[in-house]
Amino acid sequence: MVAFDANEALTPCREGRGIGAILFDRERLRQAEADLFSPQHWGSKARPVGEGGRGSAWFIDAPFGASVLRHYLRGGLAAKISHDQYLWRGADRTRSFAEFRLMRALREKKLPVPRPLAAFYMREGLRYRAAILMERIEGVRSLADRALVAGRGAPWEETGRLIARFHRAGLDHADLNAHNILFDGNGHGWLIDFDRGVIRIPATAWRERNLKRLLRSLIKLRGERSVEDVQKDYVRLRRAYDMAWNRGT
């Protein structure tokens, strides 16, 4: 987490019995209201994101630029208890504020991360729900899509070097999967979805955990490709990762 800085602005908001706040980038947004985080508010300017996630993200054509809105939803067994409610542990520990500030910290390290625009939470008692709004990277395709279409021609080495770069900066990505690795038209790689991510001292255990999670997702999303083919491509990714890590790049 990074400290509050001059380019951040914080404004309170209310919704029925709920009390919340919005943390936003004052360089991009002159002001922020809770409506920004409602897809209904945007009407036809909001389009569901089709790939990955749980149906909780939208592309937004906003006056301040092409953006992505994402609501925080629970997964697994927790979703049966509460769809979008999290235990309140303070504003700075909300999922949205933590991700907003982590993204800012990564951008300060010159890493390829979308620019966070605004983060929102609404609290009622001991529970809260949250959302985040960020800049959209135009013309990108996920590694999952590239692997399905191009197979061995997908950017495996580039992916390995990209991950090594983030790991060198200490990013422990909580959900490193093939949907969260993007490549633009110029071949530049990006990482997205930093919910529950943290900056740590680089260590083997969590780096290996990230990479194993990515391999599992590649196998799961392989389509008609064989597991053997995916594993061969992963070997190329891992070799490039190890070389970049050992060089310190």
UniProtKB/Swiss-Prot annotation:
Domain of life: Bacteria
Pathway: Bacterial outer membrane biogenesis; LPS core biosynthesis
Active site, per annotation: 175
Membrane topology label: Peripheral membrane protein
Record family assignment: Belongs to the protein kinase superfamily. KdkA/RfaP family.
Sorted UniProt keywords: ATP-binding, Cell inner membrane, Cell membrane, Kinase, Lipopolysaccharide biosynthesis, Membrane, Nucleotide-binding, Transferase
Documented EC number(s): 2.7.1.166
Main location: membrane
Annotated GO MF terms: ATP binding; protein kinase activity
InterPro entries: KDO_kinase, Kinase-like_dom_sf
Pfam families in the cross-refs: Kdo
GO CC annotations on file: cytosol; plasma membrane; preribosome, small subunit precursor
NCBIfam families for the chain: PRK01723.1
Cell compartments where the protein resides: Cell inner membrane
Record has Membrane as a keyword: yes
Name this protein carries in UniProt: 3-deoxy-D-manno-octulosonic acid kinase
Catalytic activity: an alpha-Kdo-(2->6)-lipid IVA + ATP = a 4-O-phospho-alpha-Kdo-(2->6)-lipid IVA + ADP + H(+)
Described function: Catalyzes the ATP-dependent phosphorylation of the 3-deoxy-D-manno-octulosonic acid (Kdo) residue in Kdo-lipid IV(A) at the 4-OH position.
GO BP, one annotated term: maturation of SSU-rRNA
